[in-house]
Structures are given as structure tokens and as C-alpha cells.
Amino acid sequence: FEYGEKELIYLKQKDKRLAEVIDQVGMIERTVDDDLFSSVVHHIVGQQISTKAQATIWQRMKDYLGTVDADTILNAGVEHLQPLGISFRKAEYITDFAEKVKDGSFDIEGIWKKSDEEAIEELSSLKGIGVWTAEMILLFCMQRPNVLSFGDLAIQRGMRMIYHHRKIDRKLFEKYRRRLSPYCSVASLYFWAAAGGAVPGLKDHAPKSGADCKKKAAEQVEKVTAS
């Protein structure tokens, strides 16, 4: 994900606590997949499975299909996708997506011209793609600069740790979103880093009863940082 001194200087001037995290962590390098079709398929494959399992299945798909595009997906069909380790439902989602791209009912090139809100709405209309997944596609495929996901438990965990809050509700979240805009995507990288333990001394201020949320947040950190 491309960013530089301009974005970091802006964020550090806007937020002293985030500035401390940025200084300790340094630049964060994250790979992106700028092929929108394969990015959507990759995210569908990875839902509700471990990062390791996702990587294994994805490699099988690339080995079998050669190129992951609408034509190769449709030529394979559900019956040949399933033996690669993909569930029947996910295989249906993937082939449905390929059909919509092929017949033009989903304008995949047109997405690039949409606003963030419009792109999220269109992507999340696809079977198997929710709002959070659409937001991750905007960030790690389309490289949109201002993505901050309220539905991302790891983002919320990072915010709790950096700003010492017990809970991040929508009102508080929007306050930070406004403060960090128009470079929320870069801020997201540092919230994930904090949530993953990259900053010694930071702790999660969520109530002890939130143990399940903390576990899910940790899993989401792994998923996002490995994608």
C-alpha cells in the first residue's frame, strides 16, 4: 500500500497519540492486489477459514486455473472448484460473480470510477461480499486513501489501546474518522499494528467480559496483515 511522508506528517500533526505509534512502528509495507476480479475471489475464498488455509487454497486455484479471471472460473465451474478445497457455497458465489462480470451486469471497470460509498455498496451487493470485505478491497486492491472500517474488530482494538477507551462506539469512531481524514487508510495500518502487539506497553482497555471480542480482533489482525 503506497504512502509516504506527506500522509505521516499530516496524521502526526493531527493526533499526538497516533504520532507516538507511527514513530515506534515506522513505515509499514503491505502488498496489494490491483486486479479487482482476483481480489474479490481471493476474499471470498478466505472467509471463515484460517489465513494458512486461504493461502493453500488460493495457490491451488492459481495452479489449476493459471489465471484467475471470469473465463477460467466459468470454464472450471462449481464442480471443478470444489475439489480445490472451496465449499459449495463459496464456489457458487465465485461463479455467480464471474457470470455477472462476463454478462456485464456487474461493471467491474466502472467500480474504479465510483466514490468510496458507491463502490462499497456495489461490491457488497455481490453474493459472499459484505461491507467489511468491500472495505478491505477498497484498501488493499483499489488503494483508496480514506478507508477506516467500523466493523473491523482489530481496528476497534487498536483504537482502544492507543486512545485508552473501554469501548469504541459509532460516535467516538466518527470523531477519529473526521480527525484522520483524508488519510484514514494509513491510520488503519497503524491501528492494526497496535492491535497486533507492535507497540510495547499498550494494552486493550476493553472490559474483561470482552475476551471473545479480543480473540476475534486478534484473528482479524492476522487475516488483514497476511492478505
Where are these regions (language model features)?
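A positional/architectural concept
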Residues: 6, 13-59, 63-66
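A general alpha-helix detector
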Residues: 39-44, 76-80, 118-122, 136, ...
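Flexible, active-site-adjacent loop/turn segments at secondary-structure boundaries
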Residues: 26-28, 35-38, 47, 84, ...
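Short amphipathic alpha-helical interaction patches enriched in hydrophobic/aromatic residues
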Residues: 44, 77, 81, 105, ...
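Alpha-helical ds-nucleic-acid-binding substructure associated with the helix-hairpin-helix region
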Residues: 17-21, 49-50, 54-125, 179-181
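C-terminal accessory module of base-excision DNA glycosylases/AP lyases that mediates lesion recognition
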Residues: 1-28, 92, 117, 131-140, ...
